[in-house]
Amino acid sequence: MFSRILNTLAFFFPLGYSLRPTLHRIRGVKIGKNVWIAKSVYIDELHPENVIIGDNSAINYRTTIYTHMYFGPKQKDHTGKVVIGKNVFIGPHCLILPDVTIGDGAVIKGGTVVSRNVPPNTLWGIPNAGPLAKVTVPLTPGHTQEEFVKGLRPIRSKKNSPGK
């Protein structure tokens, strides 16, 4: 319960270089020197001791770090460590899953789900958003999700065209 209270305070309080890292250290997160943690960063409440953050790293707004996953009442919970190396930059709105190591000097693009290890000094993330399909049936209350899906048409790009 105490860990949840500290996590909630760290989620909202200012001072990303001092107060937020200190609150997470009290919870059991291992945090190096000169680490910046933005507001609205969530670090796992059940196993904060499984998170290690190296010196000179930055974790941006609305990033979530999980060290456990719950798969339902018939399966055992999965718990793992998250190791964030030195000089790492994590962009906003990232999700970091258990059993992940982010190497020293890595940069994680905003909006990325990190589900496997990231090598050191690597820019890691999904490609820029782009067109996925042509919408012929709008996804509105007047149509079902099935109608929407059936109405999707492929978009052919020069890159995907045969013979190019």
Residue ranges and their predicted role:
Residues M69-G72:
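Blade-loop segments of beta-propeller domains
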